[in-house]
From Swiss-Prot:
InterPro entries reported for this sequence: Ecdysteroid_UDP-Glc_Trfase (IPR016224), UDP-glycosyltransferase (IPR050271), UDP_glucos_trans (IPR002213), UDP_glycos_trans_CS (IPR035595)
Name this protein carries in UniProt: Ecdysteroid UDP-glucosyltransferase
Transmembrane regions listed in the UniProt entry: none
Protein encoded by which gene: EGT
Keywords: Glycosyltransferase, Signal, Transferase
Length: 515
């Protein structure tokens, strides 16, 4: 009888601490959704109740990653998302260089406006519309930080604190929202840039202008999204800048060292490697016998090559594709190359190369014979390589990958290349250097041990702070900063400094004229 009472008491206590969480993760990208899936499942294991709006993502190995749970209500907006996103990707091919490279020149308001329209369409999904009309209440709203449109949820569920979570780096706009140091062309560069090192004075000036252009592009994008929200939901809807004031916490899924240890207030929490937590298990980590045999028999070493889930070898121009093929032909190692089966037939693939549409990446990287990881520089791939102690050769293609690869060289964990100009000779030289030079391996192991020396694992931190925001009904008051959402003119105290300068100049000018 006492045991029954104890069990019932524990059940009541657990449910009394449970919170209701509304999540919206709109980007139909496997690398994004992998992070959010791990976070959602961790909250479910804690007994919390979640409503999740997202497009279901299927990868090559297994289906949708969310585990069915009685406390989970999923609203799958894939029917209004996936084809839309495919068209966006198809349209973006026009501006790509060498068939696959999207540098900072492609980061424009027009290109990202399509993403906002896609999310606007998600809000027209019938189940989402019913949710917005309902009288449901939530303790916390958690939304993807990459885009601003989901902030509209804070208008419908008023007085509910918002947490933004990024699958990788935070944007400059995210940091402005939190009152953190957001823009500095040298120390805290915009993650959308593609040039960071070895710059001449003139090149540095050009990068400053790139920073200014990006600021103007995304400011206009915010204005466009504000107008879209008012057309969709009515003229009383606040603009994006006002909705950002409802954000109480931000999770950034990178290690602070990869953000140059940016000064941030306490309501910005860096995670980094959330999806490689020991509590996370997945069928994606399984390895078949043929692959195991290939790895075991590769006594000279293995080079693992994956340019991410959104890059297809068939999109490369013939010159770029030949650079990879000739490099693999000339190195003494065996190669695992992740290439989609629907890609063009490679009649001249060297005999030392094994091609598959998918590999269990974490297991492959942890094999003792893997010497180098040739990667596009994505955040999740970088985390997995560091966790496995494998040095990297970065071939950046888009977004924050240029910055991530720059950090490889900064911390001595690998090397990078200019994807627009690289040839087979240079690619071969760098592969051999990273494979043979122990300093890259040692640098990776050192960095891994340093970033893992923390009082709390990333996933535990994300869950704890989510519960903290729910318990305290927000976090801005005690963890935030007064600098949050402040304009640059106010932050720099122009209203005080400009009159002072004018007064000083006028006084000086009067003295000059009176002489």
């Amino acid at each position: 009888m006492k045991m029954i009472i104890l069990v019932v008491s524990l059940h009541v206590l657990r449910n009394s601490a449970a919170v209701r969480v509304l999540c919206m993760f709109p980007t139909p990208s496997y690398s994004h959704q992998t992070v959010f899936d791990v976070y959602v499942n961790a909250l479910l294991r804690r007994g919390h109740s979640l409503v999740v709006i997202s497009p279901k993502i299927h990868n090559h190995n297994h289906g949708h990653r969310h585990h069915r749970h009685e406390n989970l209500t999923e609203i799958d907006v894939g029917s209004v998302t996936n084809n839309f996103f495919k068209r966006l990707l198809q349209d973006s091919k026009v501006s790509r260089k060498r068939g696959i490279v999207s540098d900072s020149s492609t980061v424009t308001r027009v290109n990202y406006l399509g993403l906002a329209r896609m999310i606007s369409a998600q809000f027209e999904h019938e189940q989402v519309k019913r949710l917005l009309r309902s009288n449901q209440t939530f303790d916390v709203i958690v939304i993807e930080a990459f885009v601003s449109y989901p902030l509209i949820l804070s208008y419908f569920f008023k007085d509910t604190p918002v947490i933004q979570i990024s699958s990788g780096h935070g944007t400059a706009e995210n940091f402005e929202t939190m009152g953190a140091v957001a823009r500095h062309p040298v120390y805290y560069p915009n993650m959308w840039r593609d040039r960071f090192k070895g710059l001449s004075v003139w090149q540095t000036v050009r990068q400053v202008f790139t920073e200014i252009r990006l600021y103007m592009e995304f400011s206009q994008l915010d204005a466009d999204q504000s107008a879209m929200m008012k057309r969709q939901f009515g003229s009383k809807v606040p603009d994006v800048d006002a909705l950002r004031k409802n954000v109480h916490m931000m999770f950034v899924n990178t290690h602070p060292v990869f953000d140059t240890n940016r000064p941030v207030p306490s309501n910005v929490q860096y995670l980094g490697g959330i999806h490689i937590d020991p509590a996370v298990t997945s069928v994606a980590d399984e390895i078949d016998n043929d692959l195991a045999e290939f790895l075991e028999n590769s006594t000279m070493g293995v080079v693992y090559v994956s340019l991410g889930s959104s890059v297809r070898a068939s999109d490369m121009d013939s010159n770029m594709l030949n650079v990879f093929v000739e490099t693999f032909r000339s190195i003494p190692y065996r190669v695992l190359w992740k290439v989609d089966k629907s890609d063009k037939i490679f009649d001249n693939i060297p005999s030392n190369v094994l091609i598959q549409r998918w590999f269990p990446q974490r297991r492959v990287l942890k094999h003792r014979n893997v010497k180098v990881f040739i990667t596009q520089g994505g955040v999740q791939s970088t985390d997995e390589a560091i966790d496995a102690g494998v040095p990297m050769f970065g071939v950046p293609i888009m977004g924050d990958q240029f910055y991530n690869v720059y950090m490889y060289e900064t911390y001595g964990i690998g090397r990078g290349v200019d994807t627009l100009t690289v040839d087979a000779r240079q690619l071969t030289e760098i592969v051999m250097d990273v494979a043979d030079n122990e300093k890259y391996k040692n640098g990776t192991l050192w960095l891994r041990d340093a970033i893992m020396d923390q009082p709390m694992r990333p996933l535990e931190k994300a869950v704890w702070y989510t519960e903290h925001v729910a318990r305290r009904k927000g976090a801005k008051k005690h963890l935030g900063t007064r600098a949050a959402n402040v304009t640059y003119s106010k932050y720099a105290m122009f209203d005080l400094i400009l009159p002072m300068l004018i007064t000083i100049f006028s006084t000086y000018l009067q003295k000059i004229l009176s002489i």
